[in-house]
Amino acid sequence: MKRDGGRLLPRERMIKAGPESLSVEELVAIVLRTGKKGKHVLELSKDLLERFDGSLIKLSNASLEEIASVEGVGMVKAITLKAALELGKRLHRELERIPEKLDSSVKVYKYCQEMVYLEREIVKVICLDTKLNVIGENTLTVGTSDRSLIHPRDVFRTAIRANASGVIVVHNHPSGDPTPSKEDRLITERLKQAGEILGVSLVDHVIVSRRGYFSFREEGEL
C-alpha cells in the first residue's frame, strides 16, 4: 500500500506509529491486502465491515461463505481474515485465562465470554484441580441452533484424561435467555450422579447467554 494523495496508507502508518494507531477499517484492509478492479482495498474493507453492521463479533462469527460472498472478497481473502480473527480469539484466551481460578460463577461467565454471541450451541468442559485452578478444557459438541447434546461419558473422559478433581460444564443459549430447560436440568442430575460414581466433582453447570448466565450451583440446584 503506497501513499494516496500524500496520506500515509495503513502499512506505512503501522510502521511509523504502530498497529494501535490504525482504525478497524485500516487493520482489515491490511489483512485483505488488495481491493478489486475499480475499488481500493480501504473501500473494500469498509464494504465488508458494513455488511456485518461494523461489528467485529458478527464478522468473527460469520461463515467463510458469508464473508466470501461480499463482492470483491472471495474465498482466499475470507480464509485469511478468518485465520486472523481466530488468532485474536486465541490470544485473548491466553491473556485472560492463564492462570485462572474459577471459584465463582461470575468468573466462569467472564471466562466463557466468546460463547455468548455464537449462533449455535456448544458445550465446554473445564477441568479443575483441587484449588479450582483451570488445568484444561475441551469443546465437546456443536449442537443445532436450538439444542446441544451433553453425554456424561464424554464429559468425564475429558476430566479423567486431564487428571481433574472437578469439572465445570458450560453451554450457551443462542436465544439469549439463560433459563435452563427441562433437558438442561435432567442432564445436570445425570452429570452429578456420574461424577459421584467416578470421584470427579461436578463443580457447576453454567448456561451463558447475551443476557447473563444461570448457575446450577449458585441457584442451589446442584
Swiss-Prot record:
UniProt: Zn(2+) binding residues: H171, H173, D184
Key words of the record: Hydrolase, Metal-binding, Metalloprotease, Protease, Zinc
Signal peptide: none
Domain MPN residue range list: 101-222
Locus of motif JAMM motif: 171-184
Ranges in a coiled coil: none
GO biological process: one example: proteolysis
UniProt-recorded Gene Ontology molecular function terms: metal ion binding; metallopeptidase activity
SUPFAM superfamilies from the UniProt entry: JAB1/MPN domain (SSF102712), RuvA domain 2-like (SSF47781)
Cross-referenced Gene3D superfamilies: 5' to 3' exonuclease, C-terminal subdomain, Cytidine Deaminase, domain 2
UniProt similarity note: Belongs to the UPF0758 family.
Protein name per its UniProtKB record: UPF0758 protein TM_1557
Source organism of the structure: Thermotoga maritima (strain ATCC 43589 / DSM 3109 / JCM 10099 / NBRC 100826 / MSB8)
Source taxonomy: Bacteria, Thermotogati, Thermotogota, Thermotogae, Thermotogales
